[in-house]
Amino acid sequence: MIHQAINSNPPHLIQFYYTGDSQPGYRTVEPHMIALNLNDALCLSAWFLSGPSTSGPQGFKEYEMEFVSEVTVLEETFAGPRPGYQPDGGKILHSIQCHLLVPAPSRRSKLDC
């Protein structure tokens, strides 16, 4: 389902239930990437929009997939990658399985999964 949200043009928001921190609950996010983190755990990298958070307000967050359940692809879409997005995973993600591509100048966003 998350791959479907990322592959859509435009991409869709998702909502899921997360139990990987001290504030379990539903999160709504803009999914950007699925990859392995430094501990080789499969993670969703997403722009956090709403829900409980132990790591502050809106911004990029990583969610370990073993703690993600009840995923729903929402009808609401988003324009594409947020500022600061690193399609190569940056220093904390590797073995990318699915991700948004940064659009080329004067072209629409491309998606790759």
Segment roles from a protein language model:
Residues 1-113:
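Core beta-strand-centered patch of the WYL/Sm-like small regulatory domain
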